[in-house]
Amino acid sequence: METLSYEKRIELGNLVPALGQFKVMEKIPQYQQCEVHNLVEAPAEVPETLRHVVFNIERGQTLHETIDFLNMCPDLKNMDIIYANELDDGAVRSGNCNVAYEIAKSIGMNYAYGLEFIELVNPEDNKGFHGNALFSRWPIRWAKVVHMPEQYNWYYDRQKRIGARVAIVCSLDIGGREVGAVSVHLENRADSEGREAQMAVVYDEIKRSFAPDTPVMIGGDLNTNTFDGNDIPGFTKLFNDPERLSKHMEHVEQYERVLPQAEENGFSYREFSSIEGTRRKPMPGGKSMLLKLDWLMARGMECVDHGTISTETKDCTWAEPGSALAKFTGPELSDHNACWADCRFAK
């Protein structure tokens, strides 16, 4: 995507208090674009099962190590599609590079990328772009960005930004068959009803874009905290009550409407998603709260197997000697684990 000067970014950001995020986004062509880059040839044959992976990459701050993770992890050797969240393009914190392109090039996949936020804090950012992506070893026929209803205005956050949460809706060509693939990132600074309202827009777009019998997979960080992300005292109290926290994590669907909402729209999530926690939320005292935020949900598909892959450095024992990952001394590649599901088309 074409860059905007830092001065232009600030000029546009200054309009947000008067106009609101969406009116300002209308003035920025990059928000109407969805980049699609088909970089590799399609596989010669369609396997019996396809491996779908959901992974919040946490901006790409450990880019080289993350590329090693994707290339070397035994559970990711035959992945077909990655539903990826939080990828920078031109931000100092991730080396001022295009994270989605670097990953796609290094792991041999096609990709689609959509802009979620323009960061306004750091004048050293070449672009300050931040968004979601979908990686596929199958050709991407088309892709579009879906802007979801605002549930939190990030302009007034310490991470001052222009933008809103997005979904990337893609049509894939898998051996001549159309398959829908949707990468979603819902708002963490919201409650259950806010996230439900965001997903409603995604389901509306799926209905417009695909025939009812087209298989579709949705994957991403749905931020199913089971609490309002703005309620700091509330989730601190939850963290300090292990029995209650365990109940929340065991029965996320009782606290987060997006899960029963999926079933109401013909999508299954129970057999496709991890029963383990997927995100380590930092808490006071160096502790963390393990949450179930990352999900895969599908229609027209059956799950054969699924699992979760730790992104904590201590668990990457399979890293090849001498690689960036093997040399990495940080505690984790991302604050999210990666989740996968092997799926076949329903008969």
Residue ranges and their predicted role:
Residues 1-38, 208-214, 224-347:
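Metal-dependent phosphoester-hydrolase catalytic domains
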Residues 2-44, 87-178:
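Structured beta-strand-rich core segments of catalytic domains in phosphoester-bond hydrolases
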Residues 24, 43, 49-68, 88-92, ...:
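Acidic/histidine-rich helix-loop elements
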Residues 47, 127, 160-164, 287-289, ...:
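A generic structural micro-feature
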Residues 50-57, 70-96, 135, 170, ...:
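Active-site beta-strand/loop signature of hydrolases that rely on acidic residues for catalysis
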Residues 58, 88, 117-118, 185-187, ...:
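Catalytic metal-binding/acid-base residues of hydrolase active sites
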Residues 61-63, 90-93, 120-124, 128-131, ...:
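Short catalytic/ligand-binding loop motif for oxyanion handling, primarily in non-cytosolic enzymes
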Residues 62, 66, 99, 103, ...:
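Stable alpha-helical elements in mature extracytoplasmic
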